[in-house]
Amino acid sequence: MMNGFGIKNNGEFYSVSLQFGAHKLCGSGRFSNVYCGQMISPIEKEVAVKNVWSDTETRHLATSEYPEIQILSKLFHPAISNLLYFYSRNANDKVINCLVLDYLPQDLARLRDQGVKFDVLDAKLYTFQLFCAISHLTSKNIVHMDIKPQNVVMDRMAGRLKLADFGNARRLETNEKTGSAYQVTRFYRPPELLFGCEKFTASIDIWSATCVAFELFANRVLFKGKDTKDQIVLITGVFGYPTDDDIKSIGVKRPRVARKDARGIETFTSKMLDSEIYDFMKATLKIDPKKRKSAIDVLKMPLFDILRSSPPKKRSNGVEMPNLASYTEMHHKREPETEVVADIQTTEKAEKESDSTNEELED
């Protein structure tokens, strides 16, 4: 057992006792790692536990004030890897913030690298869910800032997708600058950040999500630049050198790359996709972020009409499509709140498993 916190529907925190079964390491990075396993109490559920090391900017903060926890506490949606509980622990004189999150077994990057191909219906289904997640973020004035295949988790059998990893997310109302044009991974970085703009808007996520959606439809990266300049060259080669109005709208200096005529997205991708997919891409991949279609407007596009058909279309694996009616709702309630959690008498085996889990999480 360990002491942690849950989240009420109004975003407030409450104390709760947490117990986990065995976990295994599922992913690691410079500042965090993720374990996957079973939560035993207060609910039985497969979860992901993200361990984040505090840095110089966050080490003085209480766990509940940690930026990612603050942002996730404002969100709850079926297409988001929701924060269920959180706690902290000390290891090697460092505070580690631990986020207990919704879990899905795969991510798009691994599936792509394994050569998995999605049929058009499933690609539309996953794209729809991704833009539902962005629409929910926009309604809460939040920008993810790092949408990429590694942060898109999935259950292929069930046809479900969740947007994960909000470590770079920001609130729009703070008028905060990005601080660096490197906030978004290069292949998915929109032109305004490549050009050096430090202001961020919800349109950043629109560009990134469209690049991810292309991978669902085409099974390859859309803009695979070798470096920042090459990324700019690729994008301007498709859409043309930014106009005077584009530069003024973005508020940056002119990029120092050769001026070429626009090839167009169809030619660049060898006209491999259906026209309605290109209509979607041309509406969301605009040099000027103010001209990109919003997530809520994207969801109304003809691209997704097949998902609204009645009766629902059958997926190729025979499994019914998820009920998408709730995905477009802006407000979702968390699980029934339990503020007082009874102590659970554990067996010797469970105690040993818990001790083993704690040792693993401290590695």
From Swiss-Prot:
Tissue: Expressed during multiple stages of spermatogenesis, in males and hermaphrodites (at protein level).
Gene Ontology MF term list: ATP binding; protein serine kinase activity; protein serine/threonine kinase activity
Every Protein kinase domain range: 20-304
UniProt keyword Transcription, yes or no: no
GO BP term (any one): negative regulation of canonical Wnt signaling pathway
Keywords, comma-separated and alphabetical: ATP-binding, Cell projection, Cytoplasm, Kinase, Nucleotide-binding, Serine/threonine-protein kinase, Transferase
UniProt region (Disordered), positions on chain: 311-363
Origin superkingdom: Eukaryota
Basic and acidic residues composition bias: residue spans: 346-355
One annotated Gene Ontology cellular component of this protein: axon
Active site (record annotation): D146
Catalyzed reaction equations: L-seryl-[protein] + ATP = O-phospho-L-seryl-[protein] + ADP + H(+); L-threonyl-[protein] + ATP = O-phospho-L-threonyl-[protein] + ADP + H(+)
Xref: Gene3D superfamilies: Phosphorylase Kinase, domain 1, Transferase(Phosphotransferase) domain 1
Record localization: Cytoplasm; Cell projection, Pseudopodium
Residues the entry annotates as binding ATP: C26, G27, S28, G29, R30, F31, S32, N33, V34, K50
EC number in record: 2.7.11.1
Function statement: May be an autophosphorylating tyrosine kinase, a bifunctional (serine/tyrosine-specific) protein kinase, or a serine kinase that is a substrate for an associated tyrosine kinase. Acting in concert with putative serine/threonine-protein kinase gskl-2, required for sister chromatid segregation and spermatid budding during male meiosis. Plays a role in regulating female meiosis II, together with gskl-2. Involved in sperm pseudopod formation and function, together with gskl-2.
Family: Belongs to the protein kinase superfamily. Ser/Thr protein kinase family.
UniProt protein name: Putative serine/threonine-protein kinase gskl-1
Gene source species: Caenorhabditis elegans
Lineage: Eukaryota, Metazoa, Ecdysozoa, Nematoda, Chromadorea
Gene: gskl-1
